[in-house]
């Protein structure tokens, strides 16, 4: 036995030491290569919070249009939801206002996003009105509906400046700086950002690798707007979704008055100008708010919330077959689109101001009713 311990224990000690070193190195490598490993802790300064998006590991992207940057926050919200989230917060505007010590008429909910891991919802809120409004991020528990403010005093974060952000012009009909970022989506290791730039073709779409290093100039866009009967470069994309068409990656972008444009991701090169195809024109006097792509009963759909047209359910099975609209044709209002993607109107959904996908079957809906704003979860129609 003495010989056994004398020979085996030293060898066992060596094995354990080697194993410990391997575990340490793997752990260190994993941490260094993770998005959180690229962040530093401290106070985050925001001038505004205009749009939200989620990336890997529960990272929350916050667009600061007035600050001309995008901030990535470690929400530390990484625990997967084991049950289906059913967010239901009636009078959410009143509850947000109470949380922030003010009244509902003194807040604005700018965006809604659901964390795809935890299923908790996050709201980009302005406390106050005008240039003195204070940006706040509010978390809504996916199960209890409890609201809490996300502290920015000591949080891990990183940021990237948008080098081609437009200058502030308070005398303009609408300050272009406020539309530096209109929407964001994360996919395939990149954050796609729509909005305005300081270029002659002001409408821009930016593709920013994450973890952040730097942001190049965006790609500037000219579209054919059938409702207006002209080419346009000044209006930003209001909302968009990454989408695969015939095996190729596209951005499906919706603009005010309501052209739907497909933009090849391969065309997005810094500082260039592109002229993508308009494949639908859903009608003037309307602003699209949010888009949610999904699959149901073997078919592909895109849900679009709008200010005037209500919530539309676009049939997206064969987007590659729709010809480009290159003349002033407008689909008629009876769902018989003479040039564009067919759709149905979801009459049960009214007053919708924000949408965010919860999972493959459900969507979070922020809507305005007679008694204020309500946040609910419904099955995708």
Predicted features and spans:
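Sequence/structural signature of beta-propeller domains
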Residues: 30-381
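Cleavable N-terminal signal peptides
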Residues: 18-19, 29-31
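N-terminal secretory signal peptides that target proteins for export/translocation
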Residues: 1-10
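Bacterial N-terminal signal peptides
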Residues: 13-24
């Amino acid at each position: 036995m003495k010989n056994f311990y004398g020979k085996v224990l030293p060898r066992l000690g060596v094995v354990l030491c080697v194993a410990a070193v391997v575990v340490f190195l793997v752990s260190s490598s994993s941490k260094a290569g993770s998005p959180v490993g690229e962040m530093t802790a401290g106070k985050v300064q925001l001038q505004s919070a205009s749009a939200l998006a989620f990336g890997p590991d529960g990272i929350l992207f916050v667009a600061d249009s007035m600050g001309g940057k995008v901030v990535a926050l470690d929400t530390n919200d990484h625990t997967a939801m084991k049950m289906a989230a059913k967010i239901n917060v009636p009078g959410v505007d009143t509850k947000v206002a109470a949380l922030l010590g003010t009244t509902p008429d003194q807040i604005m909910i700018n965006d809604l996003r659901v964390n795809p891991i935890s299923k908790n919802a996050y709201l980009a809120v302005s406390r106050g009105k005008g240039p003195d409004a204070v940006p706040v991020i509010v978390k809504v528990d996916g199960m209890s509906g409890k609201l809490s403010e996300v502290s920015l005093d000591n949080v891990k974060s990183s940021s990237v400046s948008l080098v081609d952000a437009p200058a502030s012009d308070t005398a303009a009909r609408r300050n272009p700086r406020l539309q530096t970022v209109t929407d964001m989506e994360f996919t395939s290791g990149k954050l796609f950002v729509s909005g305005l730039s300081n270029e002659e073709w002001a409408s821009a779409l930016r593709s920013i690798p994450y973890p952040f290093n730097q942001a190049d100039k965006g790609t500037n866009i000219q579209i054919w707007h059938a409702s207006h009967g002209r080419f346009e470069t000044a209006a930003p994309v209001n909302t968009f979704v990454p989408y695969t068409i015939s095996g190729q990656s596209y951005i499906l972008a919706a603009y005010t008055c309501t052209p739907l444009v497909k933009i090849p991701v391969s065309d997005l090169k810094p500082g260039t100008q592109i002229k993508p195809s308009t494949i639908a024109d859903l009608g003037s006097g309307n602003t699209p708010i949010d888009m949610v792509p999904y699959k149901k009963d073997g078919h592909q759909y895109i849900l679009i919330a709008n200010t005037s047209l209500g919530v539309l359910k676009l049939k997206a099975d064969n987007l590659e077959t729709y010809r480009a609209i290159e003349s002033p044709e407008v689909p008629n209002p009876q769902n018989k689109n003479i040039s564009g993607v067919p759709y149905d109107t979801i009459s049960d959904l009214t007053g919708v101001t924000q949408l965010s996908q919860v999972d493959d079957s459900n969507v979070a809906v922020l809507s305005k009713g007679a008694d204020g704003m309500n946040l609910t979860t419904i099955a995708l129609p």
